[in-house]
Design a protein with these regions (language model features):
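Juxtamembrane transmembrane-helix termini in multi-pass membrane transport proteins
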Residues: 2-73, 133-152, 156, 168
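Short hydrophobic "helix-edge" motifs at membrane interfaces and signal-peptide entry regions
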Residues: 10-11, 25, 113-116, 126, ...
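Short loop-to-helix capping motifs
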Residues: 21, 35, 124-125, 180
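Alpha-helical transmembrane segments of integral membrane proteins, especially early/N-terminal helices
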Residues: 40-46, 82, 111-123
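Selective transmembrane alpha-helices of multi-pass membrane proteins
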Residues: 67-98, 157-170, 175-208
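Core segments of transmembrane alpha-helices
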Residues: 123-132, 192-195
Length: 208
């Protein structure tokens, strides 16, 4: 892949990654309530989710999602239900403790955060279909596809993980304002409500 093409891909990927969506919302919610203890787990989960979604797109699943109403609807509802389920769980946990209680590893293991981040990122039919339209713009038709796909996947996944980590650390710095159980519970409920709202929005997605 030529350097100027790769730089264009990096710029386009950056613009895509900073757009708020289910993944960034989840990252910020967990960072505010769990702290930077789970930041690496979130970044790793986002990386895995994007790797699966992008790889599936390049292997043809994205084209199938874009043309199959049934598969698109199935993935849409799985993602929507999962987001609502997590939002309700986050809301219900708000009354249990303030930040000291929320930050205990036993309350929410890093492995669970990793799985949540990976699933929310991967189970987004719009992302899978988007990669189908996004990636071909940077492919050189006369060159072998394998090396180009490898470079683009490695680049995008690395940027996605770094983006999630930075958002998590920035959100973690805001935790100093959450010094009382009341404020911590308020932010937790807000995050839960936002996840439920994002799940409901996901349920209304239509194929482009």
């Amino acid at each position: 892949m030529d350097l100027h093409v790769w730089l264009a891909f990096v710029a386009a990927s950056l613009a895509l990654l900073v757009i708020p969506g289910p993944t960034l919302l989840l990252v910020v919610s967990y960072a505010l309530t769990q702290g930077r203890r789970v930041a690496v787990a979130m970044a790793a989960g986002v990386a895995l989710g994007d790797f699966l979604a992008m790889s599936a797109s390049l292997l043809g699943l994205g084209a199938l999602v874009a043309t199959s109403a049934t598969l698109f609807t199935l993935l849409k509802w799985i993602g929507a239900v999962y987001l609502v389920w997590m939002g309700i769980g986050l809301w219900r946990s708000a009354g249990k403790a303030g930040l000291q209680g929320l930050s205990r590893p036993a309350d929410l293991p890093a492995g669970q955060v990793f799985r949540h981040a990976a699933l929310v990122t991967a189970l987004n039919p719009k992302s899978i279909a988007f990669f189908v339209a996004f990636v071909p713009q940077f492919i050189a038709p006369g060159a072998p596809l394998g090396p180009q796909f490898t470079v683009m996947i490695a680049t995008f996944v690395s940027m996605a993980a770094l983006n999630a980590l930075l958002f998590a650390l920035l959100a973690n710095r805001m935790r100093r304002f959450l010094t009382t159980p009341h404020s911590a519970a308020w932010v937790t409920r807000l995050g839960g409500a936002a996840l439920v709202g994002m799940g409901l929005m996901t349920a209304t997605l239509r194929r482009a």
